[in-house]
Amino acid sequence: MSFRDALNLPSSEITDESVYRDRRRLLQLLALTPALGVAGCAEADPPPPPKTVVTPAQARSGFRTAEELTRLEDVTSYNNFYEFGTDKTDPSKAAKTLKLSPWTVKVGGECEKPGSLSLDELLKGIASEERIYRLRCVEGWSMVIPWTGVPLGEVLKRFAPTSKAKYVAFTTLADPQQMPGVRYRSINWPYREGLRIDEAMHPLTLLATGLYGKPLPQQNGAPLRLVVPWKYGFKSIKSIVEIRFVEKMPETAWHDLQPSEYGFFSNVNPAVDHPRWSQKTERRIAGTASKLFAERIATKPFNGYADQVASLYAGMDLKKWF
């Protein structure tokens, strides 16, 4: 079965309006300031991950939530996907230019079975699952989304990662012909993200191919994106074209851009504020005829998935390794 076939809200109304403007202003400033950027990556290595075992029951308990789903029209029209523009409504308008077939994902690095595969080859034989996850943006808003996809760990095992594979690095397509935002130096393209290997193998980590029972729309990261529900949304990289097993912590786009504001781990943590706004609360996207946001709610550690993932970070200083 092929994984491909395949809306307009008020723009730039995030958390407090100033938060949204601050994040855009940072991108504009850095685009004009070549001296800023890669500095800050030369940090001490984090402590090694503890030996943890996640039971099937623990994992399953995080696969669904009874919270009210965010409306499909909001999920598909209120997006961060800077390859298509920095306004929230830009991706739903501009991403229609993204060609989804053919789509190839290159897998390599510290593994015994590297290769370049079509999407169907990559996912062949792995049962698709529905997961209803909370999504928490670093900007202070959140959604509840029914995703369809496969466990990332099941895909990665096929490539037989070696003992040197301590991290997994991901890369988004960067094609200025299809992605107008790539023509501007708002980010050091291509967009890159990474996970520690145990995070990537965790049962909650999903390679998503759809939402609301349909293939992913282009603006939501089609045809293949990551969903890591206990981390801020920018870790859930979209439109993936490359996966690499690496020994050292990989460079990631937002950390590369501003390391003091966007850590590599970026676990949702209400006890660690962003330097320019609080992370203690969030505003759930709950669009109605009269308003886009519902009332503020308290943000939970690890976005409410602490029972499933907190053990991955036992002994780590989460304020240092934010």
Swiss-Prot record:
Pfam families registered for this protein in UniProt: Oxidored_molyb (PF00174)
Signal peptide: 1-59
Reaction catalyzed: L-methionyl-[protein] + a quinone + H2O = L-methionyl-(S)-S-oxide-[protein] + a quinol; L-methionyl-[protein] + a quinone + H2O = L-methionyl-(R)-S-oxide-[protein] + a quinol
InterPro entries tied to this protein: MsrP (IPR022867), OxRdtase_Mopterin-bd_dom (IPR000572), OxRdtase_Mopterin-bd_sf (IPR036374)
SUPFAM superfamilies registered for this protein in UniProt: Oxidoreductase molybdopterin-binding domain
GO cellular component terms listed in the entry, alphabetical order: periplasmic space
PANTHER family, A to Z: PROTEIN-METHIONINE-SULFOXIDE REDUCTASE (PTHR43032), PROTEIN-METHIONINE-SULFOXIDE REDUCTASE CATALYTIC SUBUNIT MSRP (PTHR43032:SF3)
Similarity comment: Belongs to the MsrP family.
Subunit: Heterodimer of a catalytic subunit (MsrP) and a heme-binding subunit (MsrQ).
Protein's name in the database: Protein-methionine-sulfoxide reductase catalytic subunit MsrP
Gene designation: msrP
